[in-house]
Amino acid sequence: ARPVLNRGPIGMAHFDYDGFFGDSLAQLHREARYRHFRALGRELAPGPVAFTTLDGVRRAVTVWCSNDYLGMSRHPVVLEASRHALARYGAGAGGTRNISGTHDPIVALESELAALHGKPAALVFSSGYVANDTVLATLAARLPDCLVFSDADNHASMIEGIRRSRAETRVFPHSDPAALDAMLAVAEPGRPKLVAFESLYSMNGDVAPLRELLAVARRHGALSYVDETHAVGVHGPTGGGLLEAHGLLEQADIV
């Protein structure tokens, strides 16, 4: 018999939590969807190399899925700056910025990022996923009766943020300015609109037709939200991304 978690007084019927979770895990295994996390040792060595142990043997692994495109996590200047920051500031603020304030280095970083993208201000999040999710969820929810236009191949973080906003959403074909133009043309002119897309798509390597998409959004009075996650640092004269590379920083509203 399957053991049952005791969640109520003795003798009282209660939900079989163990059974539910056990059946759910078994279903994942049957569908080959149960995720196993590979343990990797990432040492300070020329990338993209890591190490794992298979059948008791330590083996080198080539990591092709890293976002550390320029190897900055191993760069000696970055490592020295990290050591200096740890020695001076410690390992954390001890609380959120709302409660404990914001460290001077974060303020400086946000100013530098704003300048890099040609914007009046910037805000640092804990990850790119959190940034997309939070900004899109908040922005689309706060704009009254906002209508969101989302590229069909947008990252899951963007899709989740838009979903959480509960704003009406229309998905346009991937990187198709003409289709976006047609969809915006039938939207109410005075209604707040947000067009969200990526500049460089991480899943397939596509580069969006930035100039055309931004022109369509502006022509219809829509705000533009451009995810430059995989282009920053790699493209542009100063690493500002594809918007900088194509001279379009001023055309994009939110980066």
Can you describe what each PLM-predicted range is?
Residues V135-A156:
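Conserved PLP-anchoring active-site segment centered on the Schiff-base-forming lysine
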